[in-house]
């Protein structure tokens, strides 16, 4: 590990370690006087980096290091809140580096991973209403809005036949929650099965309105909006609440945030009327969220990726052709 805390070129970088023994490089950055940000690997979408981050996060929690207040995992980084009067930055860096080095090879990792099933009304009345407002007040010629929705555009951009095939792709894969952020409890999810890894450009400009519970996609990332807010993801539907600071439903009794990093999410299709009823049941406490404990065996997952490589490449070619002939917002 190279100590850069006295360097003049970039005082934010305190130390770094090169890639070695199959492990990615690590960069340790100062994030103020109470936080250390550790970034791993290159700036690319690689879920194995997230698996390593979640493994490190669990190791740090289990170690109960005196002075560590909280750990916050992200896609390929981890933010550590610490008390520098108890734990100097250099000592914290050594702890993190040692625990990261002690992790097993990524193919031997097992990540605690709950399975959560959520209902979704695709092309629903609430997101359509906000899309209509966008056309009226923000951008009348937005190419990502076709027939009053974003799904037709998403299907076109990914080289799919129509909206129904796009919806089938969304429901065909589990979605890996790599991290929570941006708003309280907002999950950043990526498709476990790359054969269904749809990608979509963001709104341009962004929307002033997005309904709470809206499901959106930008790039390869799917997110659920925990609160009504502005947004730039293409809206494909709406689901039940995933954040409840009032903790009205038993699913939120221990934590007002439903989803945690490492969860796997699948969607079932419902209509608007069904969703209204389900949301009412969530709020009165009678709805039972479908949550099952589980574990992701990373080795088995990597073997599965290898077995579907040709199918994945075929979809990416089809996807690329769709993107080439589709305008970007």
Provide a role label for each language-model segment.
Residues 2-329:
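Glycine-rich active-site loops that engage anionic ligands at enzyme catalytic sites
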């Amino acid at each position: 590990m190279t100590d850069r805390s006295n360097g003049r070129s970039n005082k934010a970088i305190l130390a770094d370690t090169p890639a070695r023994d199959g492990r990615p490089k690590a960069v340790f950055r100062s994030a103020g006087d109470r936080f250390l940000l550790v970034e791993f690997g290159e700036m690319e979408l690689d879920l194995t980096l997230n698996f390593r981050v979640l493994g490190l996060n669990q190791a740090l929690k289990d170690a109960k290091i005196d002075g560590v207040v909280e750990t916050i995992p992200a896609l390929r980084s981890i933010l550590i809140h610490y008390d520098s009067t108890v734990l100097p930055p250099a000592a914290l860096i050594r702890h993190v580096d040692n625990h990261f080095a002690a992790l097993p090879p990524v193919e031997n990792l097992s990540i605690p991973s709950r399975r959560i099933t959520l209902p979704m009304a695709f092309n629903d009345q609430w997101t359509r209403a906000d899309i209509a407002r966008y056309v009226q007040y923000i951008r009348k010629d937005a190419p990502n809005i076709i027939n009053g929705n974003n799904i037709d555009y998403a299907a076109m951009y990914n080289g799919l036949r129509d909206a129904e095939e796009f919806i089938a792709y969304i429901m065909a894969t589990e979605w890996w929650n790599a991290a929570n952020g941006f708003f309280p409890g907002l999950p950043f999810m990526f498709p476990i099965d790359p054969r269904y890894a749809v990608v979509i450009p963001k709104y341009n400009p962004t929307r002033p309105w997005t309904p709470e519970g809206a499901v959106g996609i930008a790039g390869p990332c799917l997110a659920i909006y925990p609160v009504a807010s502005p947004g730039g993801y293409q809206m494909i539907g709406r689901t039940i609440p995933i954040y409840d600071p009032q903790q009205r439903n038993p699913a939120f009794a221990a934590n007002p945030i439903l989803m945690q990093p490492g969860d796997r999410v699948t969607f079932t299709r419902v209509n608007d009327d069904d969703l209204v009823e389900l949301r009412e049941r969530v709020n009165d406490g009678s709805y039972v969220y479908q949550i099952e404990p589980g574990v992701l065996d990373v080795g088995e997952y990597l073997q599965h990726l290898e077995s579907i490589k040709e199918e994945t490449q075929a979809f990416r070619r089809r996807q690329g052709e769709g993107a080439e002939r589709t305008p970007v917002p």
